[in-house]
């Protein structure tokens, strides 16, 4: 590897503010914020809008999309068009 062209790979804390959840991992992300972690060391901090702790897919709080209304509207339009074409021909 060439020297001086690769970003620093270091421990970083990612915090999901919405879920009040943080985890320590390694990353090359750049940030000016820091946080004191549970082990007493200070690490760079990256604030997240969403993570597996708050995403509906991972938490099981998914919103079910009601497609029944769409299907019913489509079927009613189809029936009307069939009736119109049946009356004409």
Curated annotation (Swiss-Prot):
Keyword Ribonucleoprotein: yes
UniProt KW keywords: Ribonucleoprotein, Ribosomal protein
Gene3D superfamilies linked to this entry: Ribosomal protein L31 (4.10.830.30)
GO CC term (a single one): ribosome
InterPro entries: Ribosomal_bL28/bL31-like_sf, Ribosomal_bL31, Ribosomal_bL31_B, Ribosomal_bL31_sf
Region (Disordered) residue spans: 70-89
GO molecular function, one term: structural constituent of ribosome
GO biological process: translation
Coiled coil (UniProt feature): none
Domain of life of the source: Bacteria
Subunit comment: Part of the 50S ribosomal subunit.
Family: Belongs to the bacterial ribosomal protein bL31 family. Type B subfamily.
Name of the protein: Large ribosomal subunit protein bL31B
The organism of origin for this protein: Rubrobacter xylanophilus (strain DSM 9941 / JCM 11954 / NBRC 16129 / PRD-1)
């Amino acid at each position: 590897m060439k020297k001086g062209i690769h970003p620093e790979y270091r421990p970083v804390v990612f915090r999901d503010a919405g879920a009040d959840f943080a985890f320590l991992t390694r990353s090359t992300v750049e940030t000016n914020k820091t946080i004191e972690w549970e082990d007493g060391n200070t690490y760079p901090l990256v604030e997240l809008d969403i993570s597996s702790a708050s995403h509906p897919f991972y938490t099981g709080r998914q919103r079910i999309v009601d497609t029944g209304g769409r299907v019913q509207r489509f079927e009613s339009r189809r029936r009307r068009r069939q009736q119109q074409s049946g009356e004409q021909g």
